């Protein structure tokens, strides 16, 4: 008689979950951060708020962002004037945009990842779709299956309103799926759209104004699987371990509420301090079992929540400036795309490692960390092992 343990062994993969392909995409509309304050106050009919506009210009400059991609154009905003007000009923219009655009850009990223992977779509067994933008029944995961033509037997996991830490969350779930289901191939798609949060300025709401200077649109797709087929699948990173922690005494630091006016959010000024004060604990928990205590000896893929967060993490951990180069490059060229950010960084890192002749996908190093920070305050920590190039 076959034992339960024997059945369980057959059902599971032998090796660790591995990143097999990465694809990214953005809406075609690209905005110049240096002129965004002028544009933003003009399209929202706020040019009379001269002092607030000057303050917003300084906020834009401090972000160290050069460009961002956004679905919303001036033409779209003219057709939807309530979205330009500070708080006017506009959820219907926002939802109509997002349930269309979120899966569309997600499809573009997924198509690139599938092309790099080089295997038939019929081999995809699971789909994880993550977005903070738009809610529908059936979800945008269903819409993506239709757009791509995936097999209807694909097992779907739809994750809404996770926020900026979710790049780590989807890897944690994908790791469990890939390692506990033999031959599983998990397609992850994170697609974010600022149509859910765009609104006009108000001098009493600086949190919203900071968000208008920071957030952007983008999608990333990753294919995860264990036991890559030799000479057929090309491993990029192995997912060694994952962890999620709610930071004590951080309630109210980051959050949001979906209302008739769209998604409203709050960003406490203490967020950079909270993250930096807890970063060493997260690193120690992840890397002590590996005997690693020098965090300059690993590569870094950190969610680019903002310049202040990156600066304080660098200072707290005594990181060399170059450790955050990939993260800061993505921040500069794309802005904060919430859950998708870490995969843009991962993609850039492996490409730059190849271009510069380094020996591994992780800037020539063997071990690395992927961090996500977001509502809760929540910290996701993922330990990665790079692959030889």
Swiss-Prot record:
The active site is at 164. Substrate binds at residues 55-58, 267, 305-307. The keyword Lyase does not apply. One of its GO terms (molecular function) is trihydroxystilbene synthase activity. It is found in: Cytoplasm. GO terms for cellular component: cytoplasm. Induction: By stress. Experimentally, by yeast extract and elicitor from P.megasperma. It holds the Pfam family Chal_sti_synt_N. SUPFAM superfamilies: Thiolase-like. It catalyses: 4-coumaroyl-CoA + 3 malonyl-CoA + 3 H(+) = trans-resveratrol + 4 CO2 + 4 CoA. Its EC number is 2.3.1.95. GO terms for biological process: polyketide biosynthetic process. Pathway: Phytoalexin biosynthesis; 3,4',5-trihydroxystilbene biosynthesis; 3,4',5-trihydroxystilbene from trans-4-coumarate: step 2/2. The keyword Plastid does not apply. Keywords: Acyltransferase, Cytoplasm, Stress response, Transferase. InterPro entries: Chalcone/stilbene_synt_C, Chalcone/stilbene_synt_N, Chalcone/stilbene_synthase_AS, Polyketide_synthase_type-III, Thiolase-like. Belongs to the thiolase-like superfamily. Chalcone/stilbene synthases family. Homodimer. PANTHER family: CHALCONE SYNTHASE 7 (PTHR11877:SF62), HYDROXYMETHYLGLUTARYL-COA SYNTHASE (PTHR11877). This is Stilbene synthase 1. It comes from Arachis hypogaea.
């Amino acid at each position: 008689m076959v034992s339960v343990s024997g059945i369980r062994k057959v059902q599971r993969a032998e090796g660790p979950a591995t990143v097999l392909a990465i694809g990214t995409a953005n809406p075609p509309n690209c905005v110049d951060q240096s002129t965004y304050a002028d544009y933003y106050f003009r399209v929202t009919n706020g040019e009379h708020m001269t002092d607030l506009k000057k303050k917003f210009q300084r906020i834009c400059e401090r972000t160290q962002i050069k460009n961002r991609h956004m679905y919303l154009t001036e033409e779209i905003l003219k057709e939807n004037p309530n979205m330009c007000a500070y708080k006017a009923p506009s959820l219907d219009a926002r939802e109509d945009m997002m349930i269309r655009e979120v899966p569309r850009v997600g499809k573009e990223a997924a198509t690139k990842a599938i092309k790099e992977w080089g295997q038939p779509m019929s081999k995809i067994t699971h789909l994880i779709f993550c977005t903070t933008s738009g809610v529908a029944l059936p979800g945008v995961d269903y819409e993506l299956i239709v757009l791509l033509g995936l097999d209807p037997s694909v097992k779907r996991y739809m994750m809404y309103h996770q926020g900026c830490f979710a790049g780590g969350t989807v890897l944690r779930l994908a790791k469990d799926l890939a390692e506990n289901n033999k031959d599983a191939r998990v397609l992850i798609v994170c697609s974010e759209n600022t149509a859910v949060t765009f609104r006009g300025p108000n001098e009493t709401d600086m949190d919203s104004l900071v968000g208008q200077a920071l957030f952007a649109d983008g999608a990333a797709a990753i294919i995860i699987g264990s036991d890559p087929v030799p000479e057929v699948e090309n491993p990029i990173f192995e997912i060694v371990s994952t962890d999620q922690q709610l930071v004590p005494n951080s309630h109210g630091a980051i959050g949001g509420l979906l209302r008739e006016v769209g998604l409203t959010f709050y960003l406490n000024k203490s967020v950079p301090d909270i993250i930096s004060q807890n970063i060493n604990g997260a690193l120690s928990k992840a890397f002590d079992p590996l005997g690693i205590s020098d965090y300059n000896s690993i590569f870094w893929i950190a969610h680019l929540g903002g310049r202040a967060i990156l600066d304080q993490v660098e200072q707290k951990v005594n990181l060399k400036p170059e450790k955050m180069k990939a993260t800061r490059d993505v921040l500069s060229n794309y802005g904060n795309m919430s859950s998708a950010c870490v995969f843009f960084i991962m993609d850039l890192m492996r490409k730059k490692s190849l271009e510069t002749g380094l020996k591994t996908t992780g800037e020539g190093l063997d071990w690395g960390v992927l961090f996500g920070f977001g509502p809760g305050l929540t910290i996701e920590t993922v330990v990665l092992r790079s692959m030889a190039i």
